[in-house]
Amino acid sequence: WGFDGVVISDWDDVEYLVTKYRAAASYPEAVAKVINAGVDMAMVPPDDREFHQALLKAIKDGLIPRKRIDEAVRRVLTLKFKLGLFDDPYVDPAKADKIVLGADKKLARKAAAESAVLLRNENDVLPLTAKARKIVVTGPSADNLPNQLGGWSIGWQGVPDGVEVPGTTVVEGLKKGAPAGTKISYVADADKAVAQAKSADAVVVVVGEKPGAEGESDAPRPALSAEQQDLVARLQDTGTPVIEVVLAGRPLVLGKASEPDALLMGWLPGTEGGHAIADVLFGKVNPSG
């Protein structure tokens, strides 16, 4: 395909050819296989000295052509030159802060809104109009920014405890984006939310998964928790139109929560997700994901 960039393995995957995938009988054989297959850099070998020894042995034994090593080195060095690392290897703090603190908020909001998928919309519940004067918002992900970000957001399994991230939650976005005269009431407690839903014009329940990545978050059957399914079902029993927003990085079995009046898959919408979800629910953006 003409790709001339750097190819890097995933974490520990060279060793996994021996220990997990059984595709190589030894570590030196695994190193030779990945290098010959086009991998230019191994991400974090468990022991870099062992990797170097295995690589040298494979070259001396003729398992890896020297020209392949030259190619890998050339690609890595070319990338470093393009990035200016030989001129100034340090990050510009001003540029880093500008990116992290939201120089592209408009783009992030646009991308999140356009990636949302409308899975269900019975009786044209969406978009919410000015007729919906009282809207109750609830659910474990309604006011939870880390749940909008997912795994690998600052930390491996998501935002570490004690770290604050600038952004807008769904309930904050709804409050800021609601039409004049529309009251948005956030109710965290499930029982109170069900009680208040009975006198509301609409309910927005935001459900999904906690942040996570491979390992701790692996699941043979990814599904919405029973507690969240029960919450959606109880809200539906009130007779008030229920708009369910799912925030997750993968498809989920929804069970009892699969047939609300409206169902929006918001995925992991990021720091501007609150504004983006509000844009979709209030009809400012057509969900086209």
Residue positions per predicted region:
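Residues at alpha-helix termini
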Residues: 1, 37, 61-62, 83
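C-terminal non-catalytic regions of proteins with extracellular/luminal or membrane-system context
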Residues: 2, 11, 17-18, 24, ...
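Short acidic/histidine-rich active-site segments
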Residues: 4-20, 24-25, 33, 37-47
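A generic structural-conservation signal
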Residues: 7, 43, 67-68, 89, ...
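Conserved short secondary-structure transition element at the edge of the structured enzyme core
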Residues: 27-40, 74-82
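Short coil/turn segments at secondary-structure boundaries
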Residues: 46-47, 71-72, 87-94, 127-130
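Conserved, charged catalytic cores of large soluble enzymes
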Residues: 52, 74, 81-97
